[in-house]
């Protein structure tokens, strides 16, 4: 759904004269509301399956002001029960920030505060500060970003190796001029700090998406460099027989397919 708070202008022809009042251009909407709903073959976050390698359903809504400020809500079904990545069955993200072009450089800045909420496992709630820069070069778009989770209760609850976490990433996407509905995208990220999936690791994504009207189909290969050996030695969440294998299974390379409807 997209709501635009604008006033429409009408063209009026006067029969008694040759003058014509032309329709005014619609002004930029003050506020836009957009949303989406998706079905995914599994929910991966920074390379790690958050849905026990099983399908998930997701939805999002964003309210944005034309000045660049925005607030968003995002939700997904997720792992629960005996899964070693147990986040209580549901994840709800709330985040807000500001995005704006930097002068005439062609670079766009985006930054804000991101909260991760797990109603079924509240000890896992945490927040991050985030920032990114992106720029288009013809059919290519390059983006780099940083997410920082400062000292907070999450790190005390799960006794991570440090009381903060840093995530750095870079992305390159390509949309051919003759087929703009197609996007080929790549992503490489690095996690280091208190999130005890492992002391640190890399995650990667290579995929392609195709947009038709309000539908987007995406097929990607997603994975990490977490091996079965460092899964056994890194001090992951969870313990007991098979824990290391289950974490490795959640982190190993897999194909992920999604279908998203935007409104």
Regions picked out by a protein language model, each given a short descriptive name:
Residues 29-31, 53-57, 88-92, 107, ...:
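Residues that define the transmembrane beta-barrel architecture of outer-membrane proteins
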Residues 67-73, 103-109, 138-144, 177-184, ...:
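Repeated loop/turn-to-beta-strand initiation elements of outer-membrane beta-barrel proteins
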Residues 27-41:
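Transmembrane beta-strand segments of Gram-negative outer membrane beta-barrel proteins
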Residues 37-41, 59-65, 94-98, 113, ...:
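Residues on the lipid-exposed face of transmembrane beta-strands in outer-membrane beta-barrel proteins
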Residues 39-45, 75-79, 100, 113-119, ...:
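Transmembrane beta-strands of outer-membrane beta-barrel pores
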Residues 126-201, 262:
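Detector for outer-membrane/organellar transmembrane beta-barrel domains
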């Amino acid at each position: 759904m997209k709501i635009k708070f604008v006033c429409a202008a009408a063209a009026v022809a006067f029969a008694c004269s040759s003058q014509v009042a032309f329709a005014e251009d619609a002004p930029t909407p003050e506020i836009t509301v957009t949303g989406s709903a998706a079905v995914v073959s599994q929910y991966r976050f920074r390379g790690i399956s958050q849905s026990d390698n099983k399908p998930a359903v997701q939805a999002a809504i964003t309210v944005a002001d034309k000045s660049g400020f925005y607030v968003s809500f995002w939700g997904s079904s997720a792992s629960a029960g005996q899964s070693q990545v147990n986040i209580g069955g549901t994840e709800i993200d709330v985040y807000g920030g500001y995005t704006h072009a930097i002068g005439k450089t062609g670079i766009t800045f985006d930054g804000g505060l991101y909260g991760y909420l797990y109603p079924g496992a509240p000890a896992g709630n945490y927040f991050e500060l985030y920032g990114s820069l992106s720029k288009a070069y013809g059919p290519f778009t390059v983006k780099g970003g940083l997410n920082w989770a400062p000292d907070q209760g999450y790190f005390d609850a799960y006794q991570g190796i440090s009381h903060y976490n840093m995530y750095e990433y870079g992305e390159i996407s390509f949309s051919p001029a003759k087929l703009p509905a197609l996007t080929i995208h790549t992503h490489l990220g690095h996690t280091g700090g208190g999130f005890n999936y492992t002391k640190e690791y890399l995650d990667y994504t290579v995929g392609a998406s195709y947009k038709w009207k309000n539908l987007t189909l995406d097929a990607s290969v997603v994975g990490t460099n977490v091996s079965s050996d460092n899964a056994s030695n890194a001090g992951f969440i969870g313990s007991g027989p098979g824990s290391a294998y289950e974490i490795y299974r959640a982190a190993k390379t897999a194909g992920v397919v999604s279908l998203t409807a935007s409104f």
